[in-house]
Amino acid sequence: MKFIILSTILGLAGASATALTAVPIIEKIAPKSKSCPSGNTDCRTAKQAAPFLINAFKDHDIYDPKMMAAVLALMAFESVDFQYKRNQVPGRPGQGTANMQMANYNLLYAKDIPELAPKFEGVDSVEGMSDDDLNKLLDAVTVDKYNFASGAWFLATQCKQDVKDAFKKDVDEGFKLYIEECVGTEVEPRQEVFNVAKEAFGI
């Protein structure tokens, strides 16, 4: 079943039912997510991640298959198919989530989550934070329900409207703008995963 069908039923079915549909497609985009290496406590399988990903798309009103594909492709690339939620190289404190966000975005993200916001009241910048505090911030946003919502949150709140509009005109141009102008990195190594995601979505 294509994700284009999944996007249609997102608003009609419960998250658990929709997640069952999503699992094989997430596994296509992130093939290593079929299982987790023994001893890797950060890793989550597609089956574990699916309900949180589905809820995130619904919560952030992302129903366009092109944008859903882009978010999943980026998260799969950055987290090595959901095996990691903390930056591994060079091991930067505070950088992580399945979206592998820098610490400044994780602070913004935490302050956008009602359950976490009180913990970071009055904290307006990560500058000057100790490594321990940066990692405590990361710990807060890498609980599964927040970890797997990070990609949808980032696209919905941190990307300009012209980036979102670009997906409607040309999916590859939209992805290019998303990666280069919004995420601020190179599109080329991520394009291969996005090509797989497009196939999964039937785009």
Task: Describe these PLM feature segments.
Residues 1-22, 202-203:
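Fungal secretory targeting signals
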Residues 19-52, 57, 66-160:
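Peptidoglycan-targeting cell-wall enzymes and recognition modules
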Residues 63:
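Contiguous, function-dense segments enriched for cysteine-driven chemistry
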Residues 75-79, 163-188:
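Acidic helix/loop microenvironments that form the catalytic cleft of cell-wall polysaccharide enzymes
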Residues 85-87, 163-165, 190-193:
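A short secondary-structure junction signal
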Residues 145-152, 172-176, 191:
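Short amphipathic alpha-helical surface patches that serve as generic macromolecular interface elements
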Residues 154-161, 181-185, 200:
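Hydrophobic alpha-helical segments
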Residues 189-203:
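C-terminal helix/juxtamembrane-tail motif
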